[in-house]
From Swiss-Prot:
Name of protein: Antifungal protein ginkbilobin-2
Effect in UniProt of substituting R119A: Abolishes binding to yeast mannan
Gene: GNK2
Molecular functions (GO terms): actin binding; aspartic-type endopeptidase inhibitor activity; D-mannose binding
Keyword Signal assigned: yes
Signal peptide stretch: 1-26
Annotated disulfide bonds: C36-C112, C88-C97, C100-C125
Species this protein is from: Ginkgo biloba (Ginkgo)
GO CC terms of this entry: extracellular space
Length: 134
């Protein structure tokens, strides 16, 4: 009887430890692929402001919009509109989705060298942005 209780306690402890590992696993932000437009965003371009605002919108809202979110940010004074889409794997948590997209937003300009349009895939998330609707 005592052995059975010890086995049950061991199994319960093992199950709890396994659950903790699963729950604390961070988003996988390893680079997978990219496709970058050859045109670059001109320094000081009004499009750059629209693009950064649109990327912030993607980062903040994708996890709460079914893990697939499209948006655009119009510019004032004739500045080009920035169009974007972000997705996350359905199997990750909302906080991991947001963390993955935050990581990608911080890296996307260096990955694509300030391209006017880009598609970048990390293991757990994806962002596409363009100067035209898609």
């Amino acid at each position: 009887m005592k052995t059975m209780r010890m086995n049950s306690a061991f199994i319960l402890a093992f199950a709890l430890a396994a659950a903790m590992l699963i729950l604390t696993e961070a988003a996988n932000t390893a680079f997978v692929s990219s496709a970058c437009n050859t045109q670059k965003i001109p320094s000081g371009s009004p499009f750059n402001r629209n693009l950064r605002a649109m990327l912030a919108d993607l980062r903040q809202n994708t996890a709460f919009s079914g893990y697939d979110y499209k948006t655009s940010r119009a510019g004032s004074g004739g500045a080009p509109t920035a169009y974007g889409r972000a997705t996350c794997k359905q199997s990750i948590s909302q906080s991991d989705c947001t963390a993955c997209l935050s990581n990608l937003v911080n890296r996307i300009f260096s990955i694509c060298n300030n391209a006017i349009g880009a598609r970048v895939q990390l293991v757990d998330c994806f962002i596409q942005y363009e100067q035209r609707s898609f």
